Amino acid sequence: SSSHITVSDVVEMVNEYDAIGTKIGMIKKHEIADYCSDALKNGMDCRYLAYRNESIDKQTTAIRTMLHGRDVQSFVVGEPVVSLTGIQNVINNNHEGVVTAIGEPVLCHGIACVSVTLDDCLTVNAAIDVKEKKNKEIGFFRMFEKLKAQSQITTDFRAKAELLEQAQEASAQGYMIKDDIAELRPCVASTVHKAQGSTFDVAVV
């Protein structure tokens, strides 16, 4: 509808704020979670937008605590979520859906996960702690680069072969994590970049 706020509108507001150095909006920082949770409880499509992931994580926790209580789990049945990354032939980047079922916690490649089913009947293995998943995935790829670099400077053919084998194993571990574990986040907050092209009933920057 015409009342929707587009992300382009928000970006223009932020740029204007940066240019003239004056505050835009009436909501104080400590009121964001209360305002957003109230809008969501009243059936509005509300999203908190920020440039930094640290801000997103902080407000996501605060908003979800107001919606579901202090002991809220990573996923709640009935809650909209978005995929932060894509998995080929499984789930697309920025795919949104509503959680309809949650399985028991399991370890997948050493990472705590739960089976999450969305309203479009899509089921994925989702990391309970996205940061843990990212750190392990990146760690294996960095190990691959390090071992590969070491193999290129050694003159010992046996050592070179061993280093290359270890590098391939590290790369394989990284890709298994990347391809087997989804990164889902509740749709209460998003980076401005991720939200480009989206429309919301209420957008808070």
Give the residues covered by each predicted segment.
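Conserved helicase motor core of P-loop NTPases
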Residues: 1-148
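Conserved helicase C-terminal RecA-like lobe
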Residues: 98, 106-205
